[in-house]
Design a protein with these regions (language model features):
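Conserved substrate/cofactor phosphate-moiety recognition/catalytic segment
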Residues: 173-215, 316
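P-loop (Walker A) phosphate-binding loop of NTP-binding proteins
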Residues: 160
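Conserved lysine of the Walker
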Residues: 165
């Protein structure tokens, strides 16, 4: 039986890495990937490892949390790296070592394996992790959609009707040259309402379509995806209309609790726009309190945005400047 090995930080995991793994899968019976912890990217090791597991379920992924940081071609570094790799493999025999780096020579010899150097000149896949980290959006053609979506900061704006969500979301998207997700529930309601109401069954169809559109936009986004509401808002409207939401909407609202990196609540301190499709300022104030209570019950942290559009944009940008997708939110709110 033949067994291939490749290793690296995969920071992020890109088409060049995929070429290594796919070549190994085509040439050997089993494939092992050793993935290292690193500080060159904020994405945690287990997230990067799961990219590989999801894209290549047959591959064995070994997480190297305590791997050596050294990189180079000195005798000391070679010895340290070889000893660590052999330790992590714990006696697992490797017949082929796949890489596109200089270390393919000494690591393959230490393993007693065939040195399979793949696209060392980066002609087939002309990209590197360093290039990608400088601008994920510019290099997204070299990233699986599964990987790219985990690099986008997913921002949701909540609030009662006429709290400025749409204007703010659109303005931020234009400023950051990225995509924004309109409130699909509002679009659906305008098309399907009868006497200003839709059925509970119709509510069940809104969140799945909203999520489908949102995921499509996330694959096109540049650093941020700004979302005008999410399934939690649809859940709140269904509860307001019918007393209770349906099971699909309830589940998707629950999932939405963890699907966003940042939540902002637009305050009611701006003038109420009394259009035919709304139910008055008193209803706005009441619905806002219900949203706040629901967020508290769900234990979702959020930032309240107040003032005019310019003030709110600056409040959001002040948070975004300090925010790290895989960091601790409390660090920027302290």
């Amino acid at each position: 039986m033949t067994r291939g090995l490749t290793l690296g930080k995969f920071a992020p995991f890109h088409r060049g890495h995929q070429l290594l793994i796919e070549t190994a899968l085509a040439e050997t019976d089993e494939v092992v990937v050793l993935i290292y912890a690193t500080e060159v990217i904020e994405v945690p090791l287990q997230v990067r490892a799961n990219w590989i597991r999801q894209l290549y379920p047959s591959v064995t992924v070994i997480e190297a949390w305590d791997g050596p940081d050294s990189y180079g071609d000195t005798a000391e570094i070679r010895s340290e790296q070889e000893a660590y790799i052999l330790k992590k493999l714990n006696g697992l025999a490797i017949s082929h070592f796949y890489s596109s780096e200089f270390y393919g020579d000494h690591v393959s010899k230490a393993l007693g394996a065939v040195d399979r150097r793949i696209d060392e000149a980066r002609l087939q896949v002309p990209i590197s992790g360093t290039q990608l980290r400088a601008n994920y959006f510019a290099g997204k053609a070299y990233l699986s959609e599964l990987v790219y979506r985990d690099l986008i900061i997913h921002v949701c704006f909540l609030g009662a009707p006429s709290t400025g969500k749409t204007t703010l979301t659109r303005t931020l998207a234009e400023q950051h040259h990225t995509e924004w997700m309109p409130e699909y529930g509002a679009e659906f309601w305008l098309t399907h309402q009868v006497d200003r109401r839709i059925t509970l069954e119709q509510f069940e169809t809104i969140a799945p379509e909203h999520n489908r559109r949102e995921e499509k936009l996330r694959a096109q986004a540049n650093t941020y995806l700004f979302c005008d509401t999410n399934p939690i808002t649809t859940y709140m409207f269904a509860r307001d209309y019918h007393g209770t939401p349906g099971p699909i909407l309830t589940e998707l609202a629950k999932q939405a609790e963890r699907n966003y990196d940042l939540f902002f609540l637009c305050d009611t301190d701006i003038p109420y726009a009394d259009t035919w499709d709304r139910s008055g300022n008193q209803k706005r104030l009441c619905f806002q309190q219900q949203i706040i209570a629901d967020l508290a019950e769900r234990k979702i942290p959020y930032v309240v945005l107040s003032g005019d559009v310019e003030c709110r944009v600056e409040q959001v940008n002040a948070i975004l400047r300090r925010f790290k997708k895989y960091g601790n939110l409390l660090d920027i709110l302290a």
